[in-house]
Amino acid sequence: MNEIAMNAPWPPHAGATTALASLQPTTGIRIEGVRKVYAARKSSAEVVALDGINLHVPKGSIQGVIGRSGAGKSTLIRLVNGLDKPSEGKVFVNDVEITSLSEPELRQARRSIGMVFQHFNLLSSRTAFGNVALPLEIAGTPKTEIEKRVLPLLDMVGLADKRDRYPAELSGGQKQRVGIARALATEPSVLLSDEATSALDPETTDQILDLLKQINRDLHLTILFITHEMAVVKALADRVAVIEGGRIVEEGSTFDVFATPRHEVTRRFVSSVTGSGAPDWLLAQPHEPPGGKAVLRITFKGSDANQPLLSHIARTLDIDINILSGQVEMIADHPFGTLIVSLTPSPDILRQVIAKLSTNNNLVEQLGYVA
């Protein structure tokens, strides 16, 4: 990146978007009607990567975007940090329309946007200190100021004692911590994360997610991250958008999306971490076998996840209810439980059980039968 361009007068001309002078943005990221189409090549038709994306990320919140490979997640991140432009629509960061900026304006605007990469993108010839200092050097920051900025960042990510280590001497988790510190060097108000934990082991992933939550709390950063892992969404996000085929098919608070997934893609993601999916052996018996039992899946939300509703119903109706599988966990600080149970398939009994369980917005589904 050209240092002269980085230090060009700001704004470069009197008519340049005065929105950039907004000191108190009301929103972190706003995406309006975005469509991204890649032109056709000789051997293939045009590719619609994003189609009608609308997303609002409140300032200071953590927004997850989850989708399978090829769903459009990475394209979305590229549009937010200005590495690419949409075919249609607008992208705003801190109330500034990124999509309308000139190159000098965009370079300046990117200083308020930090980026954390999947594969760290560290320079092997630079120490941890040198990698974190790099964006400040490019921006022409004085050396004395660089040291004042970098050392607290290394301390924040737990690497104060690794300042002189090279990437080859660091673990994967430590490399990502350097990457996070580097992303914070220019004191951004928005942090973008592109699959930041997918190359890490489970324990290190948890540590990095805890670090991102701490940074969000302490620095009041707006965080937008993309992932293909619902466990990451569950651990980190305030809100989540599910993207499929370039469209957002579901969006809401993390708890609501987990508790009541509406789209089939969302249900598959949720069942991968909550155990709420029906096992294959059960789906193979959609009809009642002789002497069989009906199988119900019950999703408990909020305080009901900790209540003895099943035992109360079993006593009241004088029936046996067998628990086949289940778990209770915390999602976005709310209890959430899923149980798969079997019971006598009498229509009258089933009707009463479902009616009693369906109170307080619990979700009850009949999945099939077991012998």
UniProtKB/Swiss-Prot annotation:
Residues that hold ATP according to the record: G67, R68, S69, G70, A71, G72, K73, S74
EC number: 7.4.2.11
Principal subcellular localisation of the protein: membrane
SUPFAM superfamilies cross-referenced by the UniProt entry: ACT-like (SSF55021), P-loop containing nucleoside triphosphate hydrolases (SSF52540)
InterPro entries: AAA+_ATPase, ABC_transporter-like_ATP-bd, ABC_transporter-like_CS, ACT-like_dom_sf, MetN_ABC, MetN_ABC_transporter-like, NIL_domain, P-loop_NTPase
Membrane topology: Peripheral membrane protein
Enzyme class: translocase
Highest taxon of source: Bacteria
GO cellular component terms attached to this protein's record: plasma membrane
Localisation: Cell inner membrane
Every ABC transporter domain range: 29-270
One Pfam short name: NIL
Keywords assigned: Amino-acid transport, ATP-binding, Cell inner membrane, Cell membrane, Membrane, Nucleotide-binding, Translocase, Transport
Catalytic reaction equation(s): L-methionine(out) + ATP + H2O = L-methionine(in) + ADP + phosphate + H(+); D-methionine(out) + ATP + H2O = D-methionine(in) + ADP + phosphate + H(+)
GO function term, MF aspect, one: ATP hydrolysis activity
Complexes and interactors: The complex is composed of two ATP-binding proteins (MetN), two transmembrane proteins (MetI) and a solute-binding protein (MetQ).
Reported function: Part of the ABC transporter complex MetNIQ involved in methionine import. Responsible for energy coupling to the transport system.
Family: Belongs to the ABC transporter superfamily. Methionine importer (TC 3.A.1.24) family.
Protein name from the UniProt record: Methionine import ATP-binding protein MetN
Source species of the chain: Rhodopseudomonas palustris (strain BisA53)
Encoding gene, per UniProt annotation: metN
